[in-house]
Amino acid sequence: MKLGIVGLPNVGKSTLFNAITNAGAESANYPFCTIEPNVGMVAVPDERLDKLAEMYQPKKKTPAVVEFVDIAGLVKGASQGAGLGNKFLENIRRTDAIVHVVRCFDDENIMHVVADASTNVPVDPLGDIETIDLELIMADLEIARRRAEKAAKLAKSGDKKFLHEAEVFQRLSAHLDAGKSARTFDAGEDAELINGAELLSLKPIIYAANLDEDGFANQEGNKYLQQVAELAAREGAQVLPICAKLEQDIAELEGEEKQMFLEELGIAESGLDRLIKCSYSLLGLISFLTYGEDECRAWTIRKGTKAPQAAGKIHSDIERGFIRAEVIAYDDMIKYGSVNAAKEKGQLRSEGKEYVVQDGDMIYFRFNV
């Protein structure tokens, strides 16, 4: 899974990236301090995998990973190449989802890059969101218009498929031209057609509302957070309150020291853990587990994935030669204390090609090639 972290300059984007990846990207109070995308691979926290590793003491423990990409800041006009716009748009196109960092706290010492320099607004999360959204929408509008024109030309041959495609992209063009994102377009039965266009404003989005420590402790009283939450609810997006500077402090701690610090703050889990969970939920992802003395490993798949395709995540030969999946639910294994005890209680299931893998399934694949 690849998540692109975006945001206007000076909203805390690189600070958050540094905190969650410990990648040390330069963070400075001026635009474009992140010129090339910084990439950080982060292990997905999974207590189930930790427990299996504790039980089996394998040679290797391999968690699922999330790739975070800190994408260069942009300004108004990016879709026309202003600022670092072209780089921004190309880099974001390669991601599975967008984490849009928006500043939700006042600080007169932080320079705010506004879309219109004549408007002296110190903090304007909705305006910041609109600035980036419009650049994505304008880039998509160019694509939609080209698709409509191409389909219209091909439709002259009398092919009804292209006539329909031209109509769909003409409707989409009008929708985008009105300043609305592709996410809010009613594609109906044409969703697959629209998805194939790889539109930027169609990507799932998480608004990371960056708060200062006071705002994080008193979220209900933060008017900026409430504005972002209301927008996210209307769009069907996710909102994640986070304090980037606090996350930096948390990232420097480990083990019991980290847990004690979180407890002192009254936080159950770090912002990174919450962001990963939010991302999994947004993208409809789950994990299954493989286990043994050589390796215990978590694998990420989409909800609804059938057993052979899940096996293909491990190796294409296993998918090609799939015979069956021997499955134990993790919760059943914990309930009975071990895999062998769960087997004795009849909890080992033999599943075929149509089995839909569930979150937390512990699987051994039988195959022959």
Which stretches of residues belong to each language-model region?
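Conserved G1/Walker A P-loop phosphate-binding module
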Residues: 1-120, 126, 133, 144, ...
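C-terminal-of-GTPase-core extension/linker across diverse P-loop GTPases
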Residues: 2-6, 11, 17, 145, ...
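Short, conserved glycine- and acidic-residue-centered signature motifs
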Residues: 81, 137, 221
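Amphipathic alpha-helical coiled-coil segments with heptad-repeat character
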Residues: 85, 122, 129, 134, ...
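Substrate-engagement module of ASCE P-loop NTPases
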Residues: 94, 135, 140, 230-235
